[in-house]
Amino acid sequence: LRVAQRLLARGDEVWALRRHPPMLDHGAIHWLSADLTQPESLRNLPRGITRLVYLPTPDRREPAAYRATFVDGLQHLLDALGRQSLQRVLLVSSSAVYGEQGGHWVDEHTPAVPRGFNGAVLLEAEQLLAAQPVTSIVLRLAGLYGPGRLQLLERLRAGRAAVPRTLPHWANRIHVDDAAAAIVHLLAL
């Protein structure tokens, strides 16, 4: 909702898709009920969509659910929207595509060598998007924190995570509001 609210504040019209749209009114967001893994549920999407932010959530943390959501779902949605009016697609990915880098700096020039299924599937989705005839942007986020995203803090408090003792120790963290601002900025380029 953070991205949608920022887009609305800019004066943009916002359509949002979820399997189960929220019951609460979130202002001027036009909610659509559909399932990215079910192409037939995407048949009646509005025409004239110019920008797409793709940041879905798989219903399970396992390879088939990730592929169905990030790869197949992206293809289904692009097919349903058509390419006529679509000018830009932004995929929210993850630094998991880089795999483990042994504590070294990671940037856009670091080779993507995912170790887990999540990184491998996200990289596949990135490649699918790059092959499309539309301007595409991939934002590889890591360490989101903020309201509702306190997993690391909760693990530290519960003793299930430890603070590294060796210095320096670098971590990738971004506040959810800063991530939303970055997405909106990239859409406007």
Segments predicted by a language model, with ranges:
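N-terminal Rossmann NAD(P)H-binding glycine-rich loop of SDR-like oxidoreductase domains
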Residues: 1-10
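N-terminal Rossmann-fold cofactor-binding loop
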Residues: 16-22, 36
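Conserved Rossmann-fold cofactor-binding substructure of NAD(P)-dependent oxidoreductases
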Residues: 28-50
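NAD(P)-cofactor binding segment of oxidoreductase domains
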Residues: 49-90, 124
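Conserved Rossmann-fold NAD(P)-dependent oxidoreductase catalytic core, especially the SDR/UDP-sugar
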Residues: 76-117
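Catalytic helix-loop patch of NAD(P)-dependent Rossmann-fold dehydrogenases
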Residues: 102-138, 164
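Glycine/proline-rich active-site loop of Rossmann-fold NAD(P)-dependent oxidoreductases
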Residues: 120-123, 132-134, 145-159, 185-189
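Substrate-positioning beta->alpha
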Residues: 149-154, 165-186
